[in-house]
Each structure stands twice: as C-alpha cells, then as structure tokens.
C-alpha cells in the first residue's frame, strides 16, 4: 500500500516533489506508516502534493502487478540482513503462530496475493483523517504555523474521509516558534 500511493494517473508523484526541489519518502513499521517530504522552498505546494499522495490512491491491476516483484525483491534484501534475521526469529519465538510473528512487510506468498481490491479495502479502513496525524517541522514563524495548519485542515477535508472528526485543538503546534526542547 505504501509503495502504491506514490502512483498517480499522471505518473510517479515523487517526480513532482523533485521538480519543486523537495524530497519525499515513506516507511512502514509495526505501528505506523509515515509519508514525509522535505524541502526549503515551496512549502505550500509541497504540503498540497503530500496530501494528494496520501489522499488520492490510484490502484490498477497493471500497476499493482508491476509492484509485486519489486516488493518481493525488497523483502528478500531485508531477509539477508543480520538484524532483520534476528528480529524475525525474535518475533517468531515470542509470538509463534500469531499474526504478530509475521514481519510487517509480509511474506513472498502474501505479497504475491495482493490485488487492487484488497489494497483499496486496506486504504479505506486505515487512511481516514481520524487515524492520521500531520506534522510540520521547520523554522516557521507563529503566523506560518497557523497558515500551514489551516492549509492542512483544508486539505484533510478535501482528500481524506473523516472517520471521527478532529477538533481544531488537535492541530496545534507542540512547541511555539523559538522554544527549545
């Protein structure tokens, strides 16, 4: 799912980030999937594109089939790393036949069974505003933070199903500009 959200009808969205001088990436762990973009200019358009990336999935039979061997190869690469092997054995030893024993990336067999329909079902279940957080980090003034948060609210309303609505209080900075940890 994480890989496929970079796909759009018009092509690979990561190329759009590159055109504006930004980088974008994602990762999935046991408890979260994070999509992030970094750049020093074009913050507004970068945020727009990030919400488009997570809010407009483009799943086709063709692009899902094309991604399966890529993900299987990535999984095989991880399975050659000693720290992955140790973690995998620890999970299997701790959880046995429970689903928690299976690596978050899945297995070669489970990856082969992915379809656009089950990707869409997983997306619909998990990619809702009430299950997502937006974080902006940088040297922003208080007014810039307020502008970014208003933009994030508008884009969330535009691109994401609500689930249970976030209150405005959920969209406040953790630290005011200029504060130290």
Model-derived segments and spans:
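Short, intrinsically disordered, charge-balanced linker/junction segments flanking boundaries
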Residues: 175-181
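Charge-rich, well-structured scaffold segments of protease-associated domains
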Residues: 9-175
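Catalytic Zn2+-binding segment of zinc metalloproteases
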Residues: 1-11
């Amino acid at each position: 799912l994480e890989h496929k959200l970079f796909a759009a009808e018009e092509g690979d969205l990561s190329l759009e980030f590159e055109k504006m001088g930004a980088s974008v990436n994602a990762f999935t762990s046991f408890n979260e999937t994070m999509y992030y973009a970094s750049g020093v200019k074009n913050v507004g358009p970068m945020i727009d594109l990030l919400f488009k990336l997570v809010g407009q999935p483009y799943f086709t039979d063709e692009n899902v089939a094309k991604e399966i061997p890529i993900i299987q190869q990535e999984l095989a690469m991880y399975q050659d790393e000693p720290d992955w092997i140790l973690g995998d054995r620890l999970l299997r030893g701790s959880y046995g036949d429970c689903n928690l024993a299976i690596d978050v990336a899945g297995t070669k067999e489970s990856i082969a069974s992915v379809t656009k329909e089950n990707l869409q079902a997983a997306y619909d279940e998990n990619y809702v505003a009430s299950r997502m957080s937006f974080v902006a980090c940088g040297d922003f003034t208080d007014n810039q933070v307020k502008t970014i948060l208003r933009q994030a609210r508008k884009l969330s309303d535009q691109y994401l199903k609500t689930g249970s609505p976030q209150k405005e209080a959920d969209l406040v900075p953790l630290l005011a500009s200029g504060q130290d940890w």
